[in-house]
């Protein structure tokens, strides 16, 4: 295991910042639509260790393509686990016309930081069209995260 990198200590969560907590699988919390746009919904789940996560994503009509995540530390806008995160979180989707679950428990890892050393991350959900290769951001949500110590 590598030693602490101090990323979370160097990026404290601003006091007035509103953020979400990843859910645990044992949670009995009811999932609710969490956006002003009722056609989007993102939920991050804790996995087996700090820094390891899974995500669910619901959305309205989409053409076929790929869904993936980009994450940034909130106070400095520092990209998190940039290339690896995009590849790990990438899910190919088929065209859909109605609101529904697009991504189910797709794993991803945030490497910056240490266990129990929390900081705020802006989690962005992106879509890349298989027809045009155009990328567009579908939504973002702020979560309290920690890094994976390897």
Q: Model regions: which residues?
A:
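Hydrophobic residues positioned within well-ordered beta-strands of beta-sheet architectures
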Residues: 53-55, 121-123, 141
């Amino acid at each position: 295991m590598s030693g602490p990198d101090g990323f979370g200590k160097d990026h404290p969560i601003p006091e007035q910042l509103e953020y979400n907590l990843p859910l645990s699988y044992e949670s009995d919390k009811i999932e609710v639509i969490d956006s002003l746009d009722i056609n989007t919904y993102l939920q991050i789940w804790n996995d087996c260790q700090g820094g390891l996560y899974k995500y669910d994503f619901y959305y309205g009509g989409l053409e076929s393509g790929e869904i993936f995540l980009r994450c940034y530390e909130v106070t400095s806008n520092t990209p998190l686990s940039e290339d690896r995160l995009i590849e790990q979180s990438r899910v190919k989707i088929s065209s859909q016309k109605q609101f529904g679950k697009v991504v189910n428990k797709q794993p991803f890892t945030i490497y910056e930081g240490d266990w129990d050393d929390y900081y705020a991350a802006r989690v962005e959900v992106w879509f890349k069209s298989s027809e045009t290769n155009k990328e567009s951001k579908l939504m973002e949500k702020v979560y309290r995260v920690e890094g994976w110590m390897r």
